[in-house]
Every structure is written in structure tokens, then in C-alpha cells.
């Protein structure tokens, strides 16, 4: 148990200083991670996250104000990072008064952060997101596979974003007593957005990779176009399957590849969409979803989500209540669900119920406060 003084302040007073603690993410600033990583800490009142990793990408400041590149930027920085990665030798950490806890993002992050936690005599907490524990290539000849038994032994809590992720972690040997299921919350407006009179498109947000069901969407869209349905589909993101979508855009009208957009622009796209498409599948390499953060994000904007009936997606979407579920990999079923939300009565009913569900169960402030309690020793 970490001992810290409770924080109280009178109205108008300067907020008390929070205690810094380290959050480890090896590559900080991947566009697909910015929103859900930041939201984990927005309700903290006693701890102040200091992000640390070996690589700081250009968009890293979007996750938090305090960023450290492991080893620094000086002439010895590359050597420090090499020794840390391969030998577990921890360079000096230029932060005073750190709380004795390290929060690592993703399973591999836990493996890399293990020597850091040991060097600081700090407790280790690891958040697992899905593919990080499910993808088979992560478990052969990697730093994760080599250090995993030690990570299990040293970690106080494995925080899982869904029950499905917790089940995979248990199969990887994590004791049930160390598993905590805590979905990442979402910032929900005080009032549900008013239904749009004429939303004009379906929406996908995420990386263009196999597990996101890109091929399923392509098949479904081709079926809809063959039936005369010309509703546009907007793809926000990027990735290795972009050529598949570029080919679709050449063949059929109404396909927009918007690239990565800032969080505010993504919210606006969600608020104006017929539906959010999340037809994820288990990839050939074992990569699978945990709980895609775009689902609660869409619900908070009153946007109906259409997702695969498996894993964390099926936990987040109540079929025909807060969204629609379809069998994984079933393009005809996805096309049917996309047609169904064309009915404004159905679309608005699902959108309102999704908003209420997100507000009740996935409020970012409450979920974040629960995480802080775990880090403090709860």
C-alpha cells in the first residue's frame, strides 16, 4: 500500500501538488493510442503521470504534459537505450519525488519496465489491451517471452480492458488474484447529442490491419453498392491494408480515406455518422481486440456501433439495445446491419441507448479514479 496524504482544497484554492509517477510506453505517441492512453489518467487527483519510453513520436505530447525519453537526448542516449532494452540496465531518471509505482502499458511494456521498477524499488502495475497478450509472435524469442515469468511474479495488478483480455492473460499464466478488469472510460457530454436529421455516412476509425475487419468491410460495401446502396463510408486511420481500401475507392463511389485525425475531429465525424463499423476478427497471427476504445467514444457521441459478436466488443455492445452485433467475418450480416441503421428510428434508438450506457458504465473520470486507487495500493 502506498501511503499518501489525501488531497483537499477549498473552492478557488490552488490545487495541491500531485506526486509524480512513471508510466512506461516504449513508443509514445502512436496516433491510434493517443485518446485512450490519455483518458486513463484524467481523473487522477493524487498522482501525476510522467510518461517515459525509448521513442517519443511527434504526437507524444497529446498523451500528457510530462514526457521523458529514456536515456535522454545527449550523445550517450542511444547507448543507454540499447543497454536498457537488451540488458535491463536502467539509466538515471531525472525526476525527484517519484511515487513507488510504475504503470506499464501493454504486456511488452511490462517486460521492458520490469528492470525500471526494480531499480526504483517500485511496485509494477501492467495494463493489458488485447493483442499484446493474444498475438502469437509476441511469445517466441522476444523480450516479453523471456521476462514473462518474472513479470508475473513482480506485478501487483494486471489491469485488463475487458473480460476477454483477462481470459487470455489467465491462459498465459497470470493468477486470477492478480487480474483486474477495468475498461477504459470515455468523456461523455452532459446531454446526449441531438439526433442529426441527415447523417450521411458510415464510419471506421482505427488502424488498417487484419484484426480490424477491413476485408469484411470491403466485402460488405461491395455488396451494398451492388444492391444500389450508395451511402458513403469514411475511413479514419492508416495502416498496411490501405491498398485494399484504395482499390475499393477506385472501384466504387463514396469511399473517403481521411487519414489520422485529431481527437476532436474524430468526435465530430462520429457525431455525424450513421454508424461506427467495428467488425473485428481474430487475425491469422492471433492478434485480437481487447475493447476497442472507439466503441465507447462513438456511444458518447450518440453514434450507433456495429461490431463483431465476440470478445470485448460483445461486452461493450448490447445487441439491438446499444448497437448491433454481427458474426465475425460475416460480410452479408455486416451489410444487413449497415442497411438497418439507415432507418432513423432504429439509428436514433441505438444511439441514445449507447450514450446512456457510456454515461452510466464508462465515465472516464470514474474509471480513471478506479485506476488511481489500484496504483495507490487498492
Language model regions located:
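Acidic donor-binding loop of glycosyltransferase active sites
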Residues: 271-287, 303
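Conserved acidic donor-binding segment of nucleotide-sugar-dependent glycosyltransferases
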Residues: 316-320, 324-331, 338-345
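Short hydrophobic beta-strand element within catalytic cores of glycosyltransferases
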Residues: 295, 300, 304-307, 317
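Short His-centered aromatic/hydrophobic patch
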Residues: 104-109, 128
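N-terminal subdomain of nucleotide-sugar transferases
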Residues: 1-68
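Conserved donor-binding/catalytic core segment of Leloir-type glycosyltransferases
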Residues: 22, 193-225, 234, 276
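Nucleotide-activated donor-binding/catalytic signature segment of Leloir-type glycosyltransferases, i.e.
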Residues: 243-267, 275
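Carbohydrate-associated surface elements
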Residues: 164, 185
Amino acid at each position: 500500500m502506498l501511503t499518501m496524504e489525501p488531497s483537499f482544497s477549498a473552492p478557488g484554492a490552488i490545487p495541491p501538488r500531485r506526486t509524480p509517477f512513471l508510466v512506461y510506453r516504449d513508443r509514445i505517441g502512436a496516433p491510434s493510442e493517443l485518446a485512450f492512453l490519455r483518458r486513463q489518467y484524467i481523473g487522477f487527483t493524487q498522482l501525476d503521470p510522467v510518461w517515459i519510453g525509448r521513442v517519443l513520436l511527434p504526437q507524444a505530447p497529446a498523451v500528457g504534459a510530462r514526457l521523458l525519453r529514456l536515456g535522454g537526448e545527449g550523445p550517450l542516449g542511444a547507448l543507454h537505450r540499447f543497454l536498457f532494452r537488451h540488458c535491463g540496465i536502467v539509466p538515471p531518471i531525472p525526476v525527484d519525488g517519484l511515487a513507488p509505482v510504475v504503470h506499464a502499458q501493454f504486456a511488452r511494456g511490462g517486460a521492458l519496465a520490469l528492470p525500471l521498477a526494480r531499480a526504483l524499488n517500485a511496485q509494477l502495475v501492467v495494463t493489458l489491451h488485447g493483442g499484446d497478450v493474444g498475438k502469437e509472435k509476441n511469445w517466441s524469442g522476444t523480450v516479453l517471452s523471456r521476462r514473462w515469468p518474472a513479470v508475473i511474479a513482480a506485478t501487483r495488478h494486471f489491469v485488463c480492458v475487458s473480460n476477454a483480455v483477462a481470459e487470455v492473460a489467465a491462459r498465459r499464466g497470470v493468477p486470477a488474484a492478480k487480474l483486474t478488469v477495468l475498461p477504459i472510460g470515455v468523456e461523455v457530454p452532459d446531454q446526449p447529442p441531438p439526433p442529426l436529421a441527415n447523417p450521411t455516412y458510415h464510419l471506421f476509425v482505427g488502424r488498417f490491419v487484419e484484426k480490424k475487419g477491413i476485408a469484411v468491410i470491403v466485402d460488405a460495401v461491395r455488396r451494398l453498392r451492388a444492391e444500389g446502396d450508395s451511402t458513403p463510408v469514411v475511413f479514419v486511420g492508416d495502416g498496411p491494408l490501405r491498398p485494399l481500401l484504395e482499390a475499393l475507392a477506385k472501384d466504387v463511389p463514396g469511399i473517403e480515406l481521411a487519414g489520422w485525425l485529431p481527437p476532436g475531429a474524430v468526435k465530430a465525424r462520429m457525431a455525424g455518422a450513421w454508424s461506427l463499423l467495428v467488425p473485428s476478427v481474430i487475425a491469422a497471427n492471433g492478434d485480437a481486440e481487447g475493447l476497442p476504445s472507439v466503441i465507447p467514444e462513438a456511444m458518447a457521441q450518440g453514434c450507433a456501433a456495429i461490431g463483431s459478436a465476440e470478445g470485448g466488443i460483445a461486452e461493450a455492445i448490447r445487441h439491438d439495445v446499444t448497437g448491433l452485433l454481427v458474426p465475425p467475418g460475416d460480410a452479408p450480416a455486416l451489410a444487413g446491419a449497415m442497411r438497418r441503421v439507415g432507418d432513423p428510428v432504429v439509428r436514433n434508438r441505438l444511439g441514445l441507448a449507447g450514450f446512456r450506457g457510456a454515461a452510466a458504465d464508462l465515465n472516464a473520470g470514474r474509471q480513471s479514479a478506479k485506476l488511481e486507487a489500484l496504483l495507490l495500493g487498492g
